[in-house]
Amino acid sequence: MKRIKKGKFYVVKRHPGFIISADEQKNKYLAVVTGTSKDTRHKTQLNHPIEPGVKESYVKNRPVLGKKKHFGSHELVGLRFHPDDMPLVEEISRRKPQKLK
């Protein structure tokens, strides 16, 4: 079985998601979902992109709570948050999460 690790990026509904907390016993994973869509409703633009070669990245204003089946099986390599954007990510991670169906 795959193991989802805290602090890594995985696919969440076709978008990169940064795992904030992982509880394997209860099968609950909390993630902040990012993307590059210009539709800025319910999203905040990051100061620096998370991918090389992309002009701008966005992050959803609420984290998502899901089970292991909601996340992709492979870690997304090469993605990272800039240290200037981490306070925003930590603030979003404390908000009430949306549950994935």
Predicted regions and their residues:
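Mixed-charge, Lys/Arg-rich low-complexity intrinsically disordered regions
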Residues: 1-5
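C-terminal terminal-subdomain/extension
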Residues: 49-101
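Compact nucleic-acid interaction/catalytic patches
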Residues: 6, 13-52
